[in-house]
Amino acid sequence: MQARKITEQVYWMGAVDWDRRMFDALIPLPDGTSYNSYLVQGSEKTVLLDTVDPPMEEELLDKLEDVQKIDYLVSHHAEQDHSGTLPAVLEMFPEAQVVCTPKAKGMLVDLLKLPEDSILAVEDGDSLSLGDKNLKFLHTPWVHWPETMVSYLEEDKILFSCDFFGSHIATSDLFVNDKARVYEAAKRYFAEIMMPFRNQIAKNLDKLKDLDIQMIAPSHGQIYPDPSFIMEAYKDWVHSEPRNTVVLPYVSMHGSTRVMVDHLVASLVEQGVRVEQFNLEVTDIGKLAIALVDAGTIVLGTPTMHAGPHPYAAYCAMLANV
């Protein structure tokens, strides 16, 4: 797939991973994913925002073949699916300077062995002039690592949000054109990755409220030409009161725990309570995570195994933070 124009002098340079089915050796990817990198060409300076996961390195480098110069490499997040190809891009454009938060600087030096003098650490609210375009940087700690930030292209009113507002979808469509599909994928992404940081997400949403955002370009998934769609969804997920729903994950080795679960479910339904039931032996952990976003109650069913809960149940308790 070739570089694709977003607006005047702004291009998508990323890679679509159609075949990936697991992230972090933990998170199911039923629809694949993408690693979005963006090129902004100002009248004086050119910047590349984020890179791609190293296995997709050649796709990014091929797209950069026709780019004469890169002055800055913005690294919003030190995780390797965004930063891992920085060394290869720096080899191609050795004069480029990496731009990141002070906390990310230390991480990039440690993780990627980047020389310290190649990195410019920017403070919250700093701006970078590209000539006729300006990037403003906002620190967004714990979205979802401590060093994360976003960039706002003031003239084009584009928010480059990195993992914020992301979704794991592999598609040839650059922009969101099926809101129902993207809502499901973005909610799964929020549930699996962002939900443990709900309070921090709320604070960082508040930091964005004064920006005139006309488009959101995340580092996973499609670009939002209607940013209110995903921003309102996030506000709902972090602020809304829990619903009268019981999420009931369970594991039953010989059927006895299942008997108790069935009895409890029947009683709850009789009382008008909505129940979502998940057999941990076979369930898609992403579906369970989505259910937890809105649930007011979680009941975990487990047999005793070696004087403790079944390992599947213990794993679920860790994910659900109970």
Predicted regions and their residues:
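Conserved beta-strand hairpin/beta-sheet module of binuclear metal-dependent hydrolase folds
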Residues: A3-L64, V150-L153, K157-F160, T257
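Metallo-beta-lactamase
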Residues: R4-E8, T46, C100-P218, Y224-P225
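Active-site neighborhood of phospho(di)ester-bond hydrolases with catalytic His/Asp-centered motifs
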Residues: L49-T51, K69-A78, V98-T101, L159-C162, ...
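Active-site metal-binding motif and surrounding structural segment of the metallo-beta-lactamase
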Residues: P54-V99
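Terminal amphipathic helices with adjacent charged low-complexity linkers/tails
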Residues: G221-V246
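Short helix-loop-beta junction
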Residues: D262-E276, D294
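Helix-loop-strand module that forms the ligand-binding subsite of alpha/beta enzymes
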Residues: D284-V322
